[in-house]
Amino acid sequence: MPRSTTETHTKRKNTPPPPTSPPPTSTGSGRYVIDPVTRIEGHLRIEVEIRNGQVASAWSSGMLFRGVEMILKDRNPEDAWLFTQRLCGVCTYVHGSTSVRCVENALKINVPDNARTVRNLLMGAQFLHDHIVHFYHLHALDWVDITSALKANVSATKTLANSLSPNAPAIDFATAQARLQTFVASGQLGVFAGAYWPHPAYLLSPEENLLLAAHYLEALKLQARSARMHAIFGGKNPHVQSLRVGGVTCRYDINTARINEFRALLQETRRFVETVYVPDAALLAHAYPEWAGLGGTANLMAYGEFPQSVSEPASLYFPQGVILNRGSSAALNIADIQEHVKHSWYDGDVARQPSVGVTAPRYTALNTADRYSWLKAPRYRGEPVEVGPLARVMVAYKKGHPEVKAAVDGFLSKASMTPDQMYSTIGRSAARALETQVIAKAMDGWLNLLQQGGNVFQPWSMSASATGYGLNEAPRGALGHWINIQNGVIGNYQLVVPSTWNFGPRCMADKPGPVESALVGTPVADPQRPVEILRTVHSFDPCIACAVHVIDPRQDRVYVVRAN
């Protein structure tokens, strides 16, 4: 239950006290389905078997056929990025970036330094936008009870805020509380409607809830700032227009006024990340220590991101690598990537490398013992691997990346966590915050590399036949495109996206996917309100929307709830 509203949390500077309530438990058993858990790339269905109050098995089903690979066949390779970028309106830049890299790899094109810097700044702005939106607007309400915030003592909340982050921008908590009260009094809760409150799994005090709710409202402004950063060199947001195979088209936007505008927005966003976002992530880690031991996986993979020169992967600011069984970071060999379809709605059951991948849909029926997803099951050397911010941060951490190591070690000390506890639901969210901090700092230096009037395009010519791939890190994780050019047009195009890695089904060897294995062991206090399951699912950032239906097959009842 929430702690006393009179607590001021000043005993230890910058560190909230541990929660006084134990995590809730239950003894329930049975099969439950969350369907749909919606996301930008389609609809997600999660089925779990609960035994004695814990998830014993889980099945993740992608419920929407994508088919863009079939759309791209016989088209001009130079146009592919305009199609692929429209796959997602949140990760609005990443598929375009990966597609041009893919064609450039096939045609052996090296882009000018100025173009590379612009692309890094666009990608950086994408990360800042997505991570802030995810933490506050897609994931925080799994931990924060808005109704409890209405009971908070405003003065105590100010004291708490100052103890956690003395340099944070001043926030009028009384006004924020009044705005929340207006929502409640109107009877039209909007995004806060239909949530699980009150629920025994929510452990924050009213003051902590008000603090994070106020930051939720403040973050709405910040996501607009980072979207504006995208538009300065990208032309617009969503879906930038300044990309092209061989470079970028925004040569005349690289001027003092534009650079200064970008820098001002970056500095405002960076201050929020360092003084609000990261301390809030530490607050949740302290308030929910049991979640540092839940929701983890064993294997991580990162393609790396932010090239600093033509030398890749050596020059990648976030390094490339793979971690198996939580060991050291090893070199990545993309030839060891295969996609399995034994449990997916596609013809056959042969595992293939993406370069020779086949998209041949064949829907049968949803049967968790057979085929149950439109997602394929990517594997690295036959093993499922998690991709995303945790993978990027841990690969960099184990490679001794100085900025990442300093950020992680500082957070672990503040949150009273160990490095191994990063492999968890709470660690996944922490990694996202720390990565945002590191990227924001690096972007300030990249701005100084821009050359007004400098070259932004490398001329090139189309080959009659070529093959290539483009590797990218989207905010959600490793993203790869593979192309086969035949007679100057696209003969075959394959995408392996982060959500496929993380939410894919079992493979040929019947090994569960990352989310399927991460959910095992999750305690569920009330299966009709499965906030604990959603905490781990949301921590992988599947862009949750609207309504969730939880079905109890024993009673044939449907419980309508909201995933905020």
Language-model segments: which ranges?
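Active-site bordering "gate/hinge" segments
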Residues: 2-476, 497-564
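Short acidic loop-to-beta-strand element that houses the catalytic metal-binding Asp/Glu
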Residues: 214, 480-483
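Compositionally biased, low-complexity/repeat regions
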Residues: 471-474, 482-484, 492
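Mixed-charge (Asp/Glu-Lys/Arg
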Residues: 488
